[in-house]
Amino acid sequence: MPVALVFLVVLLVLPSAALAQSGAQITISQPAEATTMDPGRSTQVLTVNYFINLYDTLTRWDNTLKLQPGLATSWKQVNDITWDFTLRQGVKFHDGTPLTAEDVKATLDRNIVPGKTVVNSGFTTIGSVSIVDPSTIRIVSQKPDPLLLVRLAQMGAQILPARLTTDDGVKELARRPVGTGAYKFVEWVKDERLVMEANKDWWGWEGKKPAIDRVIWKPIPEDFPRLVALEKGDVDIITNVPPDRSQGIAEGRNTRLLTVPSTRIVNFGMNSTQPPLSDKRVRQALQYAVDVNAIIKNIYAGQGKPIAGSVADVDFGHNSAIKPYPYDPAKAKQLLTEAGYATGVDVTLHAGTGTMVNDKALLEVIASMWSKVGIRGRVEMMEMGARQRMLNDRVVPPNGMLLGNPQSTLLDVDGSLWRIWHPNGFNGKYWIGSQPGQRFHDLMEEARYTLDPKKRKALYAEAIAIRNEEKPSLDLFQEMVVYGTSKRVSFKPRADYRLIVAEMALAGR
């Protein structure tokens, strides 16, 4: 038999896992596929995992959450509000065109124009972006900004080709991304797979070969099929691991469990523009009627800790003196009666399937807890694309609540409170009519431009206390990052939930 024919027969009988290993390929399964390939149009954690492999930012967080150079190799502060950034030379986009200062300027200009992106609130401190010379970008902030360098590493800061930042260009970008990142887009078959291959020319390899040549992202919405796929070796990494299956993965012959405390919190943002949620007492009653510790124990196997003020303890400015609301059904009933709702209120809980582990069960348990004090909670699940549209277009219905697990990508209270709850922030419109007065906004605005860290921390402490009193969201807990993986792949899990394939290694390579 000819050698070529023998080789073909061997290929046909080899198991798929062996072929994947020989080709340095891995498969990652999340419960939902991407909603877009445009980093300016989504901050959803599962979708962001695609962005951070396809694109680069001027600065970047390493896997210990320390800031490092990215597409900018260095920077200097010219004065209190002016920074010059030196761009990395020889970088090319995946379509072969060189990275230019014009691309950087066009990307940042898009982000600072209100309405152009959903990440605008994270960039409003920037006043202007200009080109000093072909290798230097100048950024001038509105006022002294203590967080400018980390803003350039956050969600939405991924640098795009200038031609794809136009109104027509972003439509193309949403379907066929072009970045400078470690992995290039190959194909996207909706509801089936998204494929990337290593960008052999990526500057970050530093002369080394990529450990993984090809990655397939396979959405599997239901928990059980996702677990089975891992156990069979059909996928190498799964996210959103059900807590009650964690031990089985940890003890599996060919699987392991990776965990780390996260920078993300779990809460429900609410549209409190109309009664009854426009009444602070009703919002507080919603919180008192939820047993957060029981949720953590029974739904999440103890993986989490209660939060106060929607701020994670890893964020600069976190105030440990402010405590979470205790579970107090009697207090909840009292507040409802005082507000004139002794017979209860109607509230709808919305969530996108795959937002987080056990999301539907979470909504159902909260609705059950509320029922004990007369709050009638209705559960509405939707596919992730519909959830993203509800979020982006700010169309959570009045007296509706939307499940989220936001994080401050700045690792600072500005990224969690200003970005989301300031009137110019992401959820600002939902707080109309129930704002805690101008004091909260003044505090956050002053802190945003305060260089002295002690003073900024004091401003944040007062703002968090006001927000915790006003309750514009139902605050639950700080998450754990949990992955199930095959033993053929290894990586250090990141607290920021980023699955960066360039940080992974394969056994034997």
Predicted regions and their residues:
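Surface-exposed binding/hinge segments that line
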Residues: 2, 21, 76, 121-164, ...
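Detector for C-terminal structural segments
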Residues: 26, 146, 189-193, 198, ...
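N-terminal lobe/hinge region of extracytoplasmic solute-binding protein
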Residues: 29-79, 109, 178
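A structural "hinge/loop" feature
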Residues: 32-48, 71-72, 97, 119-120, ...
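Gly/Pro-rich hinge or "lid" segments in bacterial periplasmic/extracellular proteins
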Residues: 66, 153-210, 214-216, 222-224, ...
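Aromatic- and charge-enriched surface segment that lines or borders ligand/interaction sites
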Residues: 73-117, 132, 138-140, 229, ...
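Structural transition elements
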Residues: 183, 305-338, 353-362
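Ligand-site clamp/hinge motif
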Residues: 201-248, 376
